[in-house]
Amino acid sequence: MNSFPDVHPTAIVGGSARLGAGVKVGPYAVIEDGVEVGEGTEVRAHAVIKRYTTIGRGNAVHEGAILGGEPQDVGFTGAETRLRIGDGNKIREGVTIHRATRPGGETVVGSGCFLMAYAHVAHECTIGDGAILANNVALAGHVDIGPRAFLSGGVVVHQFCRVGRIAMIGGNSKIVQDCLPFVVTDGVPGRARALNVVGLRRAGAGAAQLRTLKEGYRLLLRSSLRLETALERMAALGDPWVDEMISFVRGSKRGFHHAGRDAGEAD
């Protein structure tokens, strides 16, 4: 790796910006004062990284992406807030990620994420490691996306909602409540449809683990039990992944998307 950044002569880099070893900055890109870019990151043509943004190592910021813009919040007063991005992310064309609204606040993108073209991440959002946002996903403020979650194209998520770990959301879904971990949510409005078996297998879940999760799913979403009774019976399964579902439900402030009448079994 070249120990010096490679900056195209038409790019604009602020005097106080810090670029790590091997950083590449393409034609007409803009990196404002105070930005930190980790080694090996590539900022392609016409991308903009605005002040108060820190981006880690080995990221690819594609053409026309704008990172760290001011939040679209009528209450924003110009406070110093931040955008923090981890390592090894792919941020494709036209993606917009805004910094936080509240003084001292952060918008956070983890590591190993893939944000496809024209996805939007609003102020105070948190995106966990390995999450994927497909084309035109739109996250309102304060949304929390769990690790390895997959949001298909055109999904819109209401402010303050949470999407659990290894959850999947179908294309063009409208999300106004929390989406359970390990579960496929789909539709307008969103409904829990089934376990995300493909995603779980990719995450290393074996046959025994899947059977236990299917039973937890059945108790929570496909039985006639009262919620508290279902959670108690789920806890009796003694499984840490099921316990994660229980904790997610108990921590919900907006409620969670339940199964629709046409929802399938957990297969």
Protein language model features and the residues they cover:
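Terminal amphipathic alpha-helical/low-complexity segments used for targeting or macromolecular assembly
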Residues: M1-T10, G15-A17, A21-G22, G58, ...
